[in-house]
């Protein structure tokens, strides 16, 4: 959902494309997606 994408972007300062990729890779879990981006 849109709010999950916005949450990932706001927490990681990444671009939209990267946020969507991370969410897809994490099964739509924003917390996991944020951790994934931050640990890359």
PLM features: what roles do these ranges have?
Residues 1-40:
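Short, amphipathic alpha-helical interaction segments embedded in low-complexity terminal/linker regions
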């Amino acid at each position: 959902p849109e709010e999950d994408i916005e949450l990932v972007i706001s927490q990681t300062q990444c671009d939209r494309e990267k946020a969507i990729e991370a969410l897809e890779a994490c099964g739509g879990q924003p917390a996991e997606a944020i951790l994934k981006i931050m640990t890359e």
